[in-house]
């Protein structure tokens, strides 16, 4: 699965299908993260039968390998804050792509907060330049949490897959009311039933 993801685009299996199949076979898939990902998707050790797959930055639409190399060099032992990531020299558009991909979880910033921070921080710093380090007070704005469906939509828009839920899960009840048969039940149907 890891090699298939690194070989994209191939024209047939989409990343979401590869990840879904790997998960169905017991493989742990870990998200893109500023502190853990490399350009390529990689295998990580874990207890159990299989290695885990860490999604690489190549999964994030619009990122360039050169930008990722800057990030990887700058992170050293790891970023502790989003402020440190911003100071790495990445452009605002790269930071926004990373935020859209929800890649700041290890620095305790969820997608919406990270998007807010990377899209406003530079503009605010330019107007009110100060030399203080990032503090909790810098994050006093309480943004509403994103709904799971919003996360999934944004995951697909930014990485072509979601580790949070399948898009059909949000309409499963309506499909059941329409008497649609889930694909997992098709093998139980007799000819002419479906």
Task: Identify the residue ranges that each predicted region occupies.
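Noncatalytic, beta-rich nucleic-acid-contacting surfaces in large DNA/RNA-processing enzymes
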Residues: 1-194
């Amino acid at each position: 699965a890891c090699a298939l993801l690194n070989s994209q685009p191939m024209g047939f299996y989409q990343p979401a299908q590869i990840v879904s199949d790997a998960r169905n076979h017991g493989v742990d898939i870990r998200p893109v993260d500023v502190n853990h990902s490399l350009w390529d998707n990689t295998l990580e050790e874990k207890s159990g039968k299989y290695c885990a797959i860490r999604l690489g930055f190549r999964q994030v639409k619009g990122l360039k390998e050169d930008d990722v190399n800057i990030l990887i060099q700058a992170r050293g032992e790891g970023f502790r804050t989003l402020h440190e990531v911003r100071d790495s020299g990445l452009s605002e558009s790269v930071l926004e792509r990373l935020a859209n991909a929800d890649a700041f979880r290890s620095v305790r910033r969820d997608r919406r907060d990270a998007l807010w921070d990377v899209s406003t921080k530079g503009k605010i710093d330019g107007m009110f330049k100060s030399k203080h380090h990032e503090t909790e007070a810098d994050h006093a704005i309480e943004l509403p949490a994103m709904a799971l469906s919003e996360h999934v939509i944004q995951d697909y828009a930014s990485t072509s897959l979601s580790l949070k839920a399948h898009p059909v899960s949000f309409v499963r009840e309506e499909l059941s009311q329409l008497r649609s048969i889930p694909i997992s039940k098709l093998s139980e149907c007799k000819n002419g039933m479906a």
